[in-house]
Design a protein with these regions (language model features):
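Two-component histidine phosphotransfer core
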Residues: 1-154, 159-163
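C-terminal coupling/interaction segments
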Residues: 166-168
Length: 168
């Protein structure tokens, strides 16, 4: 159960997320820092519902661009959401790792999202795949010919990994 303070904080966080989605979605680009703040808020909100058996690690520390790097808004959220949707199992220990690095000398951004892989069961009939299509559409629209996207399973299928490199 949540305390009133936790509930208030969660509602404020949700409000920030919704404002970002509504107002920044129309922009061609946002600062990388703004996009990172959005991801951090999303991760913090999602942590509230997770059991202690789930490890969530983020590393956004290396992202210091002084507002000089811009990305398409909401470009990474589908992959982060997928990690929380598919990377958690109530029956076993699970993990999610998210990292963003920006190298100004190479003018390169690297986004990595990894999670424990819990394949869908035959009972899970929820539709899927739209998030990955949206990521590809955003990459093609915003960075035609200037990105690499690798995704799939690693460690004998135990880990799902997605890595995007964007060249500015």
């Amino acid at each position: 159960a949540f305390s009133p303070q936790q509930a208030q904080g969660a509602i404020e966080e949700l409000s920030r997320l919704l404002r970002y989605v509504l107002y920044e979605n129309e922009a061609e680009t946002v600062t990388l820092e703004k996009e990172i703040e959005f991801l951090e808020s999303y991760v913090e909100l999602m942590r509230l519902r997770l059991p202690s058996s789930v490890s969530v690690e983020t590393n956004f520390d290396a992202v210091k661009t002084d507002g000089q790097a811009f990305v398409a808004p909401l470009i990474f959220i589908s992959l982060v959401e997928n990690a929380f949707k598919h990377g958690i199992s109530p029956a076993s220990r699970s993990f999610i790792r998210i990292r963003v690095d920006y190298d100004s000398s190479k003018r390169q951004l690297v986004f990595v999202c990894q999670n424990s892989n819990h394949p869908k069961t035959s009972k899970d009939k929820s539709p899927g795949g739209i998030g990955l299509k949206q990521v590809l559409q955003r990459l093609e629209h915003s960075y035609p010919g200037r990105y690499e996207w690798l995704y799939g399973t690693e460690n004998d299928g135990a880990t799902y990994s997605s890595q995007i490199k964007i060249y500015f």
